[in-house]
Amino acid sequence: MAKAPKKNDSSNFSKFIKWFWILFASGFFIICLVFLLASWGFLGEMPTFERLENPQTNLATEIISSDGKTLGKFYLDDNRTPVSYDELPANLVNALVATEDERYFEHSGIDARGTLRAIVFLGAKGGASTISQQLSKLLFTKRISGGVAGRIVQKVKEWVIAIRLERQYTKEEIIAWYLNTYDFINNADGIRSASRIYFGKEPKDLRTEESAVLVGMLKNSSLYNPLRREELVLNRRNTVLGQMAKYDFISEKEKDSLQELKMDINFTPESHRDGLATYFRMYLQGFLNDWIDKNPKPAAEGERDRWNIYLDGLKVYTTVDYRMQKNAEEAVKEHMIRLQKEFFHQNTPERNSTAPFLELNPEETNRIMERAMKNSERWRIMKANGKSDKEIRASFTEKTEMTVFDWNSETEEKDTIMTPLDSIRYYKTFLRAAMMSMEPQTGHVKAWVGGLNYKHFQYDNVIQGARQAGSTFKPFVYAAAIDQLRLSPCDSLPDSQYCIEAGKHGNPEPWCPKNADGKFSGSMYTLKRALANSVNSVTAQLIDRVGPKPVVAIAKDLGIKGEILEVPSIALGTPDLNVYEMVGAYGTFVNQGVFVKPVMVTRIEDKNGTVLYEYVPETKDVLSKEVAYAMVNLMEGVTQGGSGTRLRHSSNIDQTVYKEIITGYPYEFTNPIAGKTGTTQNQSDGWFMGMVPNLVTGVWVGGEDRATHFKTITYGQGASMALPIWALYMKSNYADEELGISMAEFPEPEELTISVDCSKETEESIEKDKLDDDLDDDLDDLDF
């Protein structure tokens, strides 16, 4: 009787073993079936091999300077610029592996030990997601499924995708891909943006404790936000450092030392409207959109069929030099702050009841304000929302809180309360500026400053704005005369009243221009001396002899696109031109008569480095080498004995105007410089075009409206408003020898039959002009 239970126990054990294997096999079969179904797409869409090869990740377009630095980006929601594994520091990779997946380099996408641990301890001792699984979730299964069953299916899909990723990519590629994809919030998409935004540096320059902060954010970037939860982020950083020590990536001593460090966040937000070269970047936006319209995208499966500058991760290689751009922006800011201060001083309500406008009656002032009001964003929005003109006008007289531009603030902004109409008048009191700098031999634009502050002044005065050129147009007249009439810089003409009769050259009535000071010396002036001092009577004689038509033809060949009437008055600079055109044109003189179209973009690549666009230079032979050199020689006279002499002398340091607005004076340049100042009617525009052998730079300063200007020529001339910006910019350029800005003589042609070596008497007269220029407070600079 005692043996019966043993038989029963044996039978029960056999049944247990049988059912165990049945259940095990069934479970294994179900698991395999689930994986197969997931792999075949029956549990929801799975990425194809093509999508795994070319995932549609939104990438920002990066704008790269000629010296390899990032000028800015174009993006919508994802400010992401990928980096390769080689660009990641070892401490960042080590922190990632130690914290997120310690056996990363040992498994094939799924960590069996980690998965078993997570099941046994229900996740209490850490999750089981590998880096590859986390990447698959970021790329293909972002949405968290509801319910237990849904979550299980999603997890299975992540496992399948992770295995596929491991088969198609190296471990290093997956790490880079993961870090490039993760959203670190605060507009920091991917490791490069995160590194730049939180620490102001490239990923390769991250210190160990900084890498630990970013890796700590991978657990939950919203929770571990360095800008809002510093203590929580600090604790998380120290946890990451502890993991690194646990897995021998750093020593215990180093861990303890790093954990003692305070948080050192250097928040540097990135925005389309902030940073360096904002106006240039906005120009590029239009350039790229035009390029996209003409170049269809060869779309792969699942991709867009049109290039998108905000999503496709293009790399745009530009000609702008980061250092020179910085020098240019600093020069504009430094001078415009001082110039604006004086302009405010001269336009107080007590001194000018119609400020910022001069010499306008109330009706003319109202017309300007009315036009500005109707062109404002506020008017357009309210009109689009169905508001009546009466309602809109009423809103412009209601005080409201606003943030406006302010030179006196470190952020160039201040909060205030004023009516929208008052804000329009306030902004019109600011003088505007534009500057472009170009290598004449290549056409490469090295610096581009379209205004004071793009956020508040979005009109680009380099290429959008066209203003009267004043005396900076005169070199085109001189070039035509030397080219067509075979004159030389040493030929002389009298400074006396000169009239072109009615009916000649299309004149409806006699044209008898005056010199800027209203006087005629009666003396003979060489062309060099006449251009240096902007003698209008000599220029009038030249355009009469050569005719307006050849002058216009040369200007067009030099790249001027705007309308130029074929009438004599153009000789004194009445045409409206922009800085972009003027720099390109003047570059021809330095480049031995060959016009090179200014270029801003040399190459465009896709996210994989495939070249999509490469610039082909556009050139045109316009002038002979002799004529071009003669023109450069003429304009050297401007800085030797004319309106540009303040670049060289230091004798006026105690004069009031020099103290107030000639920023940075004395400059004391000793190297060869060719240039031309320009001032238009009523001092509405001030120009300076400056040239050295390998750099041509144009500067314009003026009000938004021509009625916004200085009252006197002393302050309102090109030599006061624009020339100091050029001088400050070049001083900074010369201080950086790596830029290689030339201080040499302008190259002379091998054969030169045009006389440029004027007599000793002529040179003495130039020196006399220079002395008179200093004593008379640059009265000879009047160059309408």
Show where each model-derived region lies.
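Peptidoglycan glycan-strand catalytic modules in the bacterial/periplasmic cell-wall system
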Residues: 13-14, 58-60, 64-257, 264, ...
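A penicillin-recognizing enzyme superfamily signal
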Residues: 322-338, 371-439, 444, 448, ...
